[in-house]
């Protein structure tokens, strides 16, 4: 059988914000979206990154198992968009589950499709996936298109797929002043989340500018220049509307 290679951008050995506990995070290369607030624009380009086998990445990750066991952690595959490399994920997570490791995917679902071949692979992947971190950038279709250059229809459909699979998910929403903090949009997002009984946690992530330097290094104009982190009261209102405390 031909070994599946994944295109990996980088890894983080002791992540604490991408799933429960301490986690080994694999950032995959390639993404279809072009989010104006992306803090990893260097992961966008498809076909670049370092080619690595699932076994190779697993062998590096498993060295940190004692930290996962002590904290309830595991491995998270992020990006970029990890679902663009579903074959690699299946192989990598199969190795992880055989070793008793908790597995998480951080995805917006922007590449989701009902294509039978993709669904067949995704079904197999869900069998070895414990948790999905689903990033919903903007529930309003027009605003989502302007913010990311892509429709949010595949993302909404991916959420429906995960609901039907009864796959545990955490919803994550980046709160950006003037872009994603409109109370009306947040209310609609809350109403959508209420249709998903498989949601186990909802997180409001305040916008930050820590990735702006990457845009400058790549020679790309940063489109949100001048926008600062949201005020505490704005974050509090978002948490109230989304009822995040009810999931704790």
Curated annotation (Swiss-Prot):
PROSITE patterns, A to Z: RADICAL_ACTIVATING, RADICAL_SAM
Positions contributing to [4Fe-4S] cluster binding: 31, 35, 38
Cofactor note: Binds 1 [4Fe-4S] cluster. The cluster is coordinated with 3 cysteines and an exchangeable S-adenosyl-L-methionine.
GO MF annotations in UniProt: 4 iron, 4 sulfur cluster binding; [formate-C-acetyltransferase]-activating enzyme activity; metal ion binding
Domain called Radical SAM core: residue spans: 17-248
Similarity comment: family membership: Belongs to the organic radical-activating enzymes family.
Job description of the protein: Activation of pyruvate formate-lyase under anaerobic conditions by generation of an organic free radical, using S-adenosylmethionine and reduced flavodoxin as cosubstrates to produce 5'-deoxy-adenosine.
Protein name (Swiss-Prot/TrEMBL): Pyruvate formate-lyase-activating enzyme
């Amino acid at each position: 059988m031909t070994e599946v290679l994944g295109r990996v951008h980088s890894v983080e050995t002791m992540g604490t914000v991408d799933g429960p506990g301490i986690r080994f995070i694999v950032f995959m290369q390639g993404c279809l979206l072009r989010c104006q607030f992306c803090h990893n624009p260097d992961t966008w380009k498809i076909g670049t990154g370092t080619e690595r086998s699932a076994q190779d990445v697993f062998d590096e990750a498993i060295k940190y198992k004692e930290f996962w066991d002590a904290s309830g952690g595991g491995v998270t595959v992020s990006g970029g968009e990890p679902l663009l490399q579903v074959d690699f994920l299946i192989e990598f997570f199969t190795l992880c589950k055989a070793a008793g490791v908790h597995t998480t995917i951080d995805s917006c679902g922007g590449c989701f499709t009902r294509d039978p071949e993709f669904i067949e692979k995704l079904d197999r992947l869900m069998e070895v996936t414990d948790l999905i971190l689903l990033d919903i950038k903007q529930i309003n279709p027009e605003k989502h298109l302007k913010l990311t250059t892509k429709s949010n229809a595949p993302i909404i459909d991916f959420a429906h797929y995960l609901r039907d699979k009864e796959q545990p998910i955490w919803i994550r929403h980046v709160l950006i002043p003037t872009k994603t903090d409109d109370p009306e949009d947040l209310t609609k997002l809350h109403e959508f989340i209420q249709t998903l009984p498989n949601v186990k946690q909802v997180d409001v992530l305040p916008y930050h500018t820590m990735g702006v330097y990457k845009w400058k290094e790549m020679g790309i104009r940063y489109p949100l220049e001048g926008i600062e982190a949201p005020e505490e009261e704005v974050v509090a209102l978002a948490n109230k509307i989304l009822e995040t405390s009810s999931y704790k």
